[in-house]
Structures are given as structure tokens and as C-alpha cells.
């Protein structure tokens, strides 16, 4: 198991002349985890997040970062906030400079980075969030999703170990929400611990490693999503709704269907459950194959050559740069979120598909497909497109 990076021990906090917002809670977060604090408005999620980088100090109890109690002197908070980056719910409250470049440069400049290093980290951060070429744009001309990306870039420029986001998809349409969640997935795969707050169970359920269900400053339940959301009474008390897949699973059980295996975490899991239930097997003589097009290694010409001989193939893109390449090359995308599972579902129908991805996400594709193959016993081949640079 990976080591603990954040830990709370019996922490409490009461706002001046207000009710107790955090009521003696304890928990831990491990390095490289994806965590969601889930609950209704007023549950204490935002207050707890603000404690993680020292914006709010507990009245009692201990908060630890990397196994050391958080100290609240200026020098200690400065180091903590470099390691634990915070993205506010409303990016307009976080973006303060007249241009995108100046805003992203604000943090590293204040940390004393030399000018050439500031330029390097800002360029890298903007590339990471898909905003290359936006350096001189005024923030007020950006869309809500673009502003959110600027705020994330400003935090990434300081290279934190932990990224904390308060309601990261607030105010975004479904497509924008999917893009932000996939960006966070990409950052997590690169080694960052990601902590979000949300009241959207459909967003949290398939995404998190663990969820912490909160109500009135207390923890109702925590654990893997199937456990955290698996008690309908707790979910009801938190004024939330069950994730659709879990609700369907529960309703099937109530009707006398004997469901085998784990509770469904994704649509792919649900399909496996249903097919096992009805003893359905795929009629295809063999599953389809998945090809990977690494935009960091393959040229647009490589794709054109490949696609000329593979018309009708479903195409998905995962990762900011992959989606940018698709847009620049006018490549129609069938999938932009949950891409790996959707390509596996296509393969089970005997159909081939292509995943556009980046260096950092290639391993994740292999890991997810191999995990499914090992669990199901169905052989699905994953190939790299030929002609890429080493």
C-alpha cells in the first residue's frame, strides 16, 4: 500500500457565531489516491478542503501532511501550499491577473522562481491543461471551462503533490465536466493525489478510488464507492440519490435475480452482470481489437495512413493533448469520456476501435484492458499504431 499523505485526527471547527462545521472527524488519504468528499450543501466539505492547505485552522485535533503535524506559521504555510494546491469552486475568485500567462505565473513568481524557470513551468502547465496559445488572452474572454483550466494551471505551475478542488465541475455543461474529470484522471495517473468535493454522485461513483460521505460535519461512511454509496439509508440521510448503476443492481436483487460478483462500478461491470445473469455469450467468433494512437509519438500522417485502411472504426480520445490533436486534424470522435471501457464494449461486439492518447496514459490503457481480460477470460488485443517515434 502507498503511504499516507494527509491525515485528520479528531478535528473540529466552528465558524465564529455559527454552528460547528466539522465535528471531530478522523480519516486518512494515501498518496496517488482519487478521493471525493460527497454530501449536500452545508455538509462541511468545503471547510474540510480549506483545512488541507492551511486556509482554515482546526479549533482542535490534529491535521498531518506527510506524517507531520501542520504548522501555521508563515514559512510552514508557504511550504504546505506549494505541496497542496487548492482550486476554488468559482475560478473568477482565483484568477486575478490581466492575462492568462500572468495569472499562471503568479504562484511561481511569488515563490521566487527565476524568470526563465517561471516561463518554463507556465508553458508546461498551460500545455498540460490544453491552453497553449492562450498566454496573452484576458481571462474575462474565456469560457467557464477554460477559466477552470487556467485556475488548475496556476496550481500545477507550482508542482504540488496534492491537488484539492472544490466542486470542480460546478457551472460546467456535461461535456466540460467530462473534460475536467478526465484531466484530473490524467494528473492522478502522473502521480498526483486528487481530492475533490461534490454532491454529484453520478460523477463521483465511477471516478473515485474512495469516497467520504459527509453530513452536518460528520462522516457517515467512507470506502470504495460500492461501499460508500452502498447503504441506501445513508445516501437518503445525506439528501443524495443512489448512483444509477447501484440502484439498478439493488432493484434486480429485490426482484429475485441472483447477481454474482461485485457490485457494478461501470457500465462495463453492469453488462457483465446482466450477461452472466441471462447466460448470454457473444456471438462474435472473436473480439475486436483496440489500437492506440499516441499523439506524443505518432504524426498526423501516421493516423491518416492507418485510417485509410480502417474505415468505420470507432475512435475515442483520452487526455487533453489527444483531444486537441483530434480537433486540429478534424478527426470525428465517437467517445470522449470513459473511452477505455467503451472500446472494450465495442470489442465484445467484435468491432475494432482506436484510442487517441498520450505518453502518460498509454500504460493505463494496457492496465485496464488486461485487468478486464484477466477477470473475464475474454482475449482482447491492444496494439500500438505502427510508425511512432521512440
Please annotate each region the language model reported.
Residues 53:
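Helix-to-loop junction immediately C-terminal to a conserved catalytic motif
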Residues 1-8, 12-24, 31, 36, ...:
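A short, flexible loop at the N-terminus of ABC-type nucleotide-binding domains that lies
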Residues 155-156:
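ABC ATPase C-loop
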Residues 235-325, 338, 356, 364-368, ...:
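ABC ATPase nucleotide-binding domains
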Residues 138-142, 146:
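Conserved ABC ATPase signature
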